[in-house]
Design a protein with these regions (language model features):
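Glycine/GP-enriched mid-protein hinge/lid loop-to-helix segment characteristic of carbohydrate kinases
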Residues: 42, 54-115, 128, 197-203, ...
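Short, positively charged and aromatic/hydrophobic N-terminal segments
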Residues: 17, 23-27, 31-35, 39-43, ...
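N-terminal accessory interaction module
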Residues: 62-199
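Short glycine-aspartate micro-motif
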Residues: 148-150, 209-215, 268-272, 341-345, ...
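Internal alpha/beta domain cores that form substrate/cofactor-binding pockets in large enzymes
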Residues: 437-457, 470-521
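Glycine-rich phosphate-binding loop and adjoining helix at the ATP-binding site
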Residues: 121-134, 138-144, 155, 159-191, ...
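Adenine-nucleotide phosphate-binding core of ATP-dependent small-molecule kinases
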Residues: 114-140, 243-256, 260-266, 402-461, ...
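Short glycine-rich phosphate-binding loop at a beta-alpha junction
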Residues: 143-153, 267-276, 457-468
Length: 521
């Protein structure tokens, strides 16, 4: 530590015990000074909010509390000491909740996700009860999808009815799900909540015949021609689907890719499509690829765009269109020669897919970007949904950007989010301790959250993909994540196996996995 001016100093690791104001602060890296009001500031003039001493001690010991529900943690992110893993909140909540309650969410074709749980049902714990049910229902909606909520609790019915009304706290979720499922959103009070009903489909792993696999990304499109399990041709073409408002551009790009692959096969027996977005019965219900297409054209020209492109080009051949996250999970299952795989891609957002114990694709939404992971009152807000504490702000480039200033990394505001991520990655490549703190914090987030995802999915393997997981930062995230699982969740040892993709996974590839989706007739 060396003085630069009065009350100014430079540090590598800073951990203040107590100053004259009776305040405590966390660990940071870089140059600091104390201003006239006794506040700790970065060298660029940015303030750090100092916590009162008693409150800071509580965080150092990992005691988390909200709405009268508390939990003790061994592992706390060094750059986000308020982080309260939602799984630990739920566990502590249920330890004292005794009143039975059921909730269910219905989606397309009569499929239902039902949870039998408990609340306190006392006046003093009503806020905690409402918060728990709010987070549970939101998790069910974004994990499995739905347009109708059922509950057998009159009090929780009134709360959910208010939240999921126009202008209510969950108006975004209500409107989104109503559009995806093409059905008005409803909350129903009943004394007979429907039980869970699923219909996972055996997709993928079909390598016989002449197949085409198409992978539609936001910046490039990939296509493969596969003959009896062997890739005989593949190409990758840059395109700009997110900035084009004319759906003819998308249609022509898809058809061009299909024809390019078909030219290298004697015939076409089946076509599989992997595409970012939400797909129900092969139809596009919501996808950022068509972000600029006017709403009035979406229904007529986008919802069936893949179906039209395939049938217009090849006639009546088997086809399958699913979310790219599910295809990633399928590629992981094929490379591992195992099942029960949750794939998580940490890039622009948090994308996910799941292959169950029987190797089947579930048809769930798996939109983990909007599933709550943090119960802290001050959790970061997602600009799109307006909610706080959801996965997108922890397991995407947004998570890195959020933590960087707390580590003393100053990112130019003019940079795009992808460029800001790259800047932190470059620091990590040079062993910058500030960047390491960012990745360690994400590793702690991930360890706690994977344990929670395990309670939702029962997954055995977790495949970690995307730009955030690339390079040395990804290795550090994985190492810290495994340590958190070992220390906080020893019961999951051997039952939950997070990993980065290996060469075998890369050989399978997204487009080849997509080609394996449909069975031949």
């Amino acid at each position: 530590m060396g003085d630069k001016a009065e009350n100014a100093f430079s540090i590598t690791v800073f951990s203040c015990r107590r100053n004259k104001k009776g305040l405590h602060c966390a660990k940071f890296f870089g140059d600091f000074h104390i201003d006239k009001r006794g506040r700790l500031c970065y060298n660029v003039g940015r303030r750090i909010t100092l916590l009162p001493a008693a409150r800071r001690r509580r965080r150092e010991h990992g005691n988390m509390e909200r709405y009268g529900i508390s939990a003790q943690l061994q592992c706390v992110p060094e750059l986000d000491t308020e982080f309260f893993p939602i799984g630990r909140f739920n566990r502590a909540f249920l330890e004292t909740a005794k009143h039975p309650l059921s909730v269910a969410v219905e989606r397309a074709d009569g499929r239902v996700a039902c949870v039998h749980t408990r609340i306190h049902n006392t006046p003093e714990m009503r806020t905690a009860d409402c918060y728990y049910i709010d987070r549970l229902v939101k998790t069910l909606l974004w994990m499995k999808g739905g347009f109708r909520i059922y509950t057998d609790s009159a009090e929780m019915y009134a709360y959910l009815q208010e939240q999921y009304s126009a202008g209510g706290g969950r108006d975004f979720d209500r409107d989104f799900m109503a559009n995806v499922y093409e059905h008005p959103f409803e909350v129903v009070l009943t004394d007979r909540v429907p039980e869970s009903c699923d219909a996972p489909k055996a997709m993928g792993g079909h390598l016989d015949g002449c197949r085409i696999g198409f992978d539609a990304g936001g910046s490039d499109r990939k296509v493969s021609a596969v003959l009896d399990g062997k890739t005989v041709y593949s190409e990758e073409v840059v395109w700009f689907p997110k900035t084009n408002s004319d759906p003819a551009y998308h249609y022509e790009g898809i058809v061009a890719a299909l024809r390019s692959a078909a030219a290298h096969l004697p015939r076409v027996d089946a076509v599989g499509v992997s595409s970012a977005g939400i797909y129900i019965n092969n139809r596009t219900m919501s996808a950022s690829l068509f972000l600029k297409v006017p709403k009035e054209q979406f229904g007529a020209q986008v919802k069936d765009i893949y179906i039209r492109a395939i049938t217009d080009t090849f006639g009546d051949v088997p086809y399958c269109v699913i979310n790219d996250g599910d295809v990633s999970a399928l590629a992981g299952a094929m490379s591992l020669n195992d099942s029960s795989v949750l794939g998580i891609a940490m890039g622009t957002s948090e994308a996910a897919g799941f292959v169950d114990e029987q190797g089947r694709v579930t048809g769930w939404l798996n939109e983990l970007a909007f599933v709550p992971v943090d119960a802290a009152a001050g959790a970061m807000q997602d600009e799109w949904s307006g909610d706080i504490g959801c996965g997108v702000k922890y397991f995407s480039q947004d998570g890195v950007i959020k933590l960087a200033p707390r580590a003393g990394i100053v990112l130019e505001e003019s940079l795009s989010p992808a460029e800001k991520l790259k800047a932190v990655q470059e620091l990590m490549a040079r062993d910058d301790p500030r960047a390491a703190a960012v990745y360690r914090s994400i590793g702690v987030y991930l360890g706690h959250t994977l344990a929670y995802y395990h309670t939702l999915y029962g997954c055995r393997h977790v495949l970690l993909l995307g730009r955030v997981m690339s390079g040395r930062g990804g290795d550090l995230i994985l190492g810290v994540c495994r340590d958190v699982l070992r220390r906080e969740y020893p019961e999951l040892e051997g039952r939950l196996l997070p990993a980065l993709p290996d060469e075998k996974f890369r050989r399978v590839g997204q487009s080849m996995a997509a080609a394996s989706l449909p069975a031949l007739r």
